């Protein structure tokens, strides 16, 4: 099945782009990664993949994306480290909605600057079926590059728009993408910035990045397959004991949920010893953290992410 689909899409992209150039915002998530590899098969180096490091990525993510797509797949990859710019723009901002808006705006500004330099004719997006079906036929813009086609006068190509998430995962596997990509858990567009409650600073993101990595490692080691598993820095300090003295440290919440589509979700019944190991590692490996909590709330009433 996938051989025909790949052949058809490669032909379609090749014919549409012609001698022109195309650009894609590559996040390292399964949708954009699959669309990028598919388009690269069609037009080679005339596809410019842009990876923007916002500073809110998972541990080792920028290095992994560069190694996978530039070194292994041979993509024409533009790596942009805009982390300082993002942190500067978010200084003093604590409102979750405001944070999301700023991150979206800065991302578009950065992507737009690169797109102008490249002078591309087409924008390739990893839009999938639920993105536009959920919004009743009106295409829901990708949170990062919404509005860009019109602003930059780019023609839009969406090779995955008729596929569902499980199909995209199958296609990614068929295209030779590593399991770390095709089986990865969903990750919020604004990244770790929405897993830091309150102001987003490099120091606070560093704490949640480490905690997040520990949660993912231990859940994987235990052989569990949740929809999502992550850590959140609550921005609440509590009293603890360090040796003979009282210590005043940060609190981290751990969230592990099961879901079919992310629309509803149940808190996972994670074995007690796994939770204890996570708590032990977070408090012993991250000196700033003194307390770990487990969130047992379903969706609804809570959302999966905290912000």
From Swiss-Prot:
It comes from the Archaea. SUPFAM superfamilies: Adenine nucleotide alpha hydrolases-like, GMP synthetase C-terminal dimerisation domain. NCBIfam families: guaA_Cterm (TIGR00884), PRK00074.1 (NF000848). One of its GO terms (biological process) is GMP biosynthetic process. Keywords: ATP-binding, GMP biosynthesis, Ligase, Nucleotide-binding, Purine biosynthesis. It catalyses: XMP + L-glutamine + ATP + H2O = GMP + L-glutamate + AMP + diphosphate + 2 H(+). PROSITE patterns: GMPS_ATP_PPASE. The gene is guaAB. The keyword Nuclease does not apply. It holds the Pfam family GMP_synt_C. GO terms for molecular function: ATP binding; GMP synthase activity. ATP binds at residues 27-33. Heterodimer composed of a glutamine amidotransferase subunit (A) and a GMP-binding subunit (B). This is GMP synthase [glutamine-hydrolyzing] subunit B. Pathway: Purine metabolism; GMP biosynthesis; GMP from XMP (L-Gln route): step 1/1. Residues 1-184 form the GMPS ATP-PPase domain. InterPro entries: GMP_synth_C, GMP_synthase_B, GMPS_ATP_PPase_dom, NAD/GMP_synthase, Rossmann-like_a/b/a_fold. Catalyzes the synthesis of GMP from XMP. The keyword 4Fe-4S does not apply. GO terms for cellular component: cytosol. Its EC number is 6.3.5.2.
